[in-house]
From Swiss-Prot:
Active site, per annotation: 158 (proton donor/acceptor), 162 (proton donor)
Record EC number: 1.17.1.8
Protein name: 4-hydroxy-tetrahydrodipicolinate reductase
Natural source organism: Aquifex aeolicus (strain VF5)
GO BP annotations listed: diaminopimelate biosynthetic process; lysine biosynthetic process via diaminopimelate
Free-text function comment from the UniProt entry: Catalyzes the conversion of 4-hydroxy-tetrahydrodipicolinate (HTPA) to tetrahydrodipicolinate.
Residues engaged in binding NAD(+): 9-14, 100-102, 124-127
This protein's record includes keyword Cytoplasm: yes
Primary location recorded for the protein, binned into one broad class: cytoplasm
Disulfide bonds: none
Cellular component, GO annotation: cytosol
Highest taxon of source: Bacteria
Pfam families with a match to the protein in the record: DapB_C (PF05173), DapB_N (PF01113)
């Protein structure tokens, strides 16, 4: 039986790619899309996206209208406040949700975790296989290099239109390094005339052009350095991961999941 999905942020860059790949998957059915009220035209999802196979599928600003007909909500609205609201609505109806929106506060993440007591929730700042492998490799390297006099730094680059900085992926990397290295002092950008402190982890964000997403973790020692880099050249890597996550989470028990669970990492 196919997985019925609703995509929040259906007309955005990621939403469009998720829908495109979902249409190519025989195990997935797109039942509708959700957008901000200012972005919802008076036409259906098929007309909005130019997809004949989606003609008659609803496009609305009210997720609750579509929940009775869906198994999994894929949340890529790009708006953390809206995403929290969508997570609450979805889990109250005992439906699963996959969240790829980034930029959440710690309090918002705790809210989402609380919602997962009612229904399965998967939250990941990046759903590509490569980035999740980068998360794991960074953790392994940090464990080996801890107390070996190596400094850890993170740099990320994205297109000029990305709203949050640093990216959710960079912040996840920072979280992994901070916990593994037991260094809690995150420094966002550098300026001034002070030397680097031993307990720091630097996080740098660059914005420009059409860069889909580059992330590098640096382990900087004396006489050598290690660089772990992931470069995304297509949003399809993220979109494919979101579709696979939706297929995986259907029927799961209530709880809080990540892409590590999907990928078995």
């Amino acid at each position: 039986m196919s997985v019925r999905v609703v995509v929040c942020g259906a007309l955005g860059r990621m939403g469009r790619r998720i829908i495109e790949l979902a249409l190519q998957d025989k195990d997935v059915e797109v039942v509708g899309g959700v957008e901000h009220p200012d972005c919802v035209p008076s036409i259906d999802l098929g007309e909005a996206l130019g997809k004949e196979e989606l003609k008659g599928k609803p496009l609305t600003s009210r997720l609750e209208e579509l929940l009775p007909y869906t198994d999994v909500v894929i949340e890529f609205s790009g708006n953390p406040t809206a995403a929290v609201g969508h997570a609450e609505l979805t889990t109250l109806e005992k439906k699963a949700i996959v969240i790829g929106t980034t930029g959440f506060t710690k309090q918002e993440i705790e809210q989402i975790k609380e919602f997962s007591k009612n229904a399965p929730v998967l939250l990941s700042p990046n759903m590509s296989l490569g980035v999740n492998l980068l998360f794991k490799l960074a953790e392994i390297a940090a464990k080996v290099l801890k107390d070996k006099n190596f400094d850890a730094e993170i740099m990320e680059i994205h297109h000029r239109f990305k709203k949050d900085a640093p990216s959710g992926t960079a912040m996840k990397l920072a979280e992994i390094l901070s916990e593994t290295l037991e260094k809690k002092n995150l420094v966002f950008g550098r300026k001034g005339e002070a030397p680097r402190k031993e307990d720091e982890i630097g996080v740098m964000a660059l914005r420009g052009g059409d860069v889909v997403g580059d992330h590098t973790v640096y382990f900087l020692g004396f006489g050598e350095r290690i660089e772990l880099t992931h470069r995304a050249t297509s949003r399809d890597t993220f979109a494919k991961g979101a579709v696979e996550a939706a297929k995986w989470i259907k029927g799961k028990e209530p709880g809080f999941y990540t892409m590590f669970d999907v990928l078995g990492l």
